UniProtKB/Swiss-Prot annotation:
Protein name: ATP synthase subunit a
GO BP annotations listed: determination of adult lifespan; locomotion; muscle cell cellular homeostasis; neuron cellular homeostasis; proton motive force-driven ATP synthesis
Classification of source organism: Eukaryota, Metazoa, Ecdysozoa, Arthropoda, Hexapoda
Membrane topology listed for this record: Multi-pass membrane protein
Keywords assigned: ATP synthesis, CF(0), Hydrogen ion transport, Ion transport, Membrane, Mitochondrion, Mitochondrion inner membrane, Transmembrane, Transmembrane helix, Transport
Keyword Membrane tagged: yes
Record-linked NCBIfam families: ATP_synt_6_or_A (TIGR01131)
Record InterPro entries: ATP_synth_F0_asu, ATP_synth_F0_asu_AS, ATP_synth_F0_asu_bact/mt, F0_ATP_A_sf
């Protein structure tokens, strides 16, 4: 029995080498195969998903978006989705359950958007601080509120993804720890519950990667 439920997220080392974060790059071994193997139905399905995302992100960015700007958000979606699914397999380090990775994705993106907006579209950024139709007496408060909400954006992006990944894994761990003390009949129901949870976790893995990419796209569209 584990003394701490969160120990399932602890990094481990082999021969004093920390190989945990290599799980983030496992996709590099699998993704290139689509370029030299005959395309299967999975490759065709994946390409259609990426094309749909490209069209949606292009719509969100609007006519002011630069050509090719959707590729960074599609790559972001692919990276997060792959790491979320990798974390569902046993004995594979869940990198997206750590703020180290999620903040490393959210903070530089947000910082680049802010620098680009304030340098190139200063008046447009100032106009965003006061919503249209705000009474004059409320303008100072609205500037403070909009500034705070803008500053916490990378934190909310990172914490949302991390919290969702942690919550599902904790539920699976809690159910798994109760297995040895159950009868054979109850273990059958436990396995069914864990399978249902894994299906839900797969849905969460897809939804959270999509939410992260869409919100990043919306933040980018605000600075144009």
């Amino acid at each position: 029995m584990m003394t701490n439920l969160f120990s399932v997220f602890d990094p481990s080392a082999i021969f004093n080498f920390s190989l945990n974060w290599l799980s983030t790059f496992l996709g590099l071994l699998m993704i290139p195969s689509i370029y030299w193997l005959m395309p299967s139905r999975y490759n065709i399905m994946w390409n259609s998903i990426l094309l749909t995302l490209h069209k949606e992100f292009k719509t969100l960015l609007g006519p002011s978006g630069h050509n090719g700007s959707t590729f960074i958000f599609i790559s972001l979606f692919s990276l997060i989705l792959f790491n979320n699914f990798m974390g569902l397999f046993p004995y594979i380090f869940t990198s997206t359950s750590h703020l180290t990775l999620t903040l490393s994705l959210a903070l530089p993106l947000w910082l680049c958007f802010m620098l680009y907006g304030w340098i190139n579209h200063t008046q447009h950024m100032f106009a965003h601080l006061v919503p249209q139709g705000t009474p004059a007496i409320l303008m100072p408060f609205m500037v403070c509120i909009e500034t705070i909400s803008n500053i916490i954006r990378p934190g909310t992006l990172a914490v949302r993804l991390t919290a969702n990944m942690i919550a599902g894994h904790l539920l699976l761990t809690l159910l798994g720890n109760t297995g040895p003390s159950m009868s054979y009949i109850l273990v059958t129901f436990l396995l069914m519950a864990q399978i249902a949870l894994l299906v839900l976790e797969s849905a969460v893995a897809m939804i959270q990667s999509y939410v992260f990419a869409v919100l990043s796209t919306l933040y980018s569209s605000e600075v144009n």
